[in-house]
Amino acid sequence: MRITTMLARVRSACIQGIDAALVSVEVDVASGLPAFNMVGLPDTAIRESRDRVRSAIKNSGFTFPMERITVNLAPADLRKEGAGFDLPIALGLLAATGLIKGERLKQFLFLGELSLDGEIRPIRGVLPMALACRREGIAGLILAPGNAPEASVVDGLAVIPVATLSQAVEFLCGEREIDPVTADPAALLAHDPGDEVDFADVRGQSHAKRALEIAAAGGHNVIMVGPPGAGKTMLARRLPTILPPLSLNEAIEVSTIWSVAGLVPSDRGLVTVRPFRAPHHTTSDAGLIGGGSVPHPGEVSLAHMGVLFLDELPEFPLNVLEALRQPLEDGEIVVARASGSSAFPARFQLVGAANPCRRGCPTLEACVCTPGERQRYLSRLSRPLLDRIDLHLELPAVSYSDLSQGPQGEPSATIRARVLAARRIQTERFAKTKVRTNAQMGEKLIRRFCQIPAEGQRLLALAMERLGLSARGHDRIL
């Protein structure tokens, strides 16, 4: 029997930074000349959904109402973007024309882009939307099968995958049974896929490996200066293999950022290893820090809880390098736009690498650069930026004797065990604070835990005088 109501409400969501806000999709079908109007600050992709929704409804075997249609995305003052409103708009139209009961729609939140034949396509940002769905007490989430693994990591939420618009209608009308998709995030984290690289592969550079172990234990930033082929990139790529595994909360936090960027692994739905990001030195400040007309996370946020490796550090534009100062200090980046500001987490370990000179000469003796050229090249790294990097390493060229020998170093698993032991000590030390690693200590904690004898104080005073260290540099040394 046809339901006479001509107004329907369907719940959906949109991304705001790395969080999600609920959106009520209100669909009104009234008599009058055929029209399809959309209000509520939709972006171009949402406005274009009129044609996608019309074709999807017709090609799914349903009748598209030839009446005056108004779609409102509430709240109206919230900017919306993306094609994820296609499915709720289509279902709202079918409900307004009496095909679906409105009471059934109230039980779920709907997300998905529609193709012209009615197929439901995955969208990005599903994980924060699923978290918002649970937070608001909504029982279930209906979305594309490609997004189901990602949403299923949210406990206490019925995730219903539907492949087409007609399947969604059949499910809502009680004509089709679809089992919810479930996942065990703890089991996903416990499954160790194994590292493709290992510290045992590194020949020589024992002092650099020791420094990276200290950096991993305390969460310190590192810069390595050495000739090409010294192993800077090789060492940096192996740093994540000795970092502690992600906890469940950390994995969900990282996965939320990656979900907004559309990078969550489709087979697991959860980022289970610490990120390693290595952007090219031609990256713009928006690409590194984040930005856009609607702010999106940059490389510093994608490296959250992991490693950000910047090779050829002096080759990066100066404005990009200086933009690193806020996330290195605060652990987050705030992107401000006229419509508002968004805060993205950016608690990463920076590993920078640089050649001693622009030409990349193998040794100082063989270098054809003048002392002034070498100084100008490295002086592109400002003092405020260098003050935020705890460990400065000079790497020599790898000798033939080191290369000719087989792997002699410790495997990553052995080093990681020592790192985990050091992290446990820090956890006990900072139990009553928000600090988790030595690198995060502020001035008060440094004064409390980093007491040095008189001889060490004299040496530090001499270093500050001769090297011109700042107060921040003083604290970093301690």
Language-model regions: role of each:
Residues I223-R268, D330:
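Walker A/P-loop
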Residues E175-F199, V264-A278, V419, K432-T433:
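Long, charged amphipathic helices and adjacent flexible linkers at domain junctions
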Residues M305, D311-L313, A323:
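Walker B catalytic acidic pair
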Residues D117, L310-P317, G360:
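Catalytic P-loop NTPase motifs of RecA-like helicase/translocase cores
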Residues A45-R50, P65, N72-G82, P295, ...:
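Basic, amphipathic alpha-helical bundle interface domains used for macromolecular binding and assembly
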Residues G226, G290, E312:
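The Walker A (P-loop) glycine that initiates the GxxxxGKT/S ATP-binding motif of P-loop NTPases
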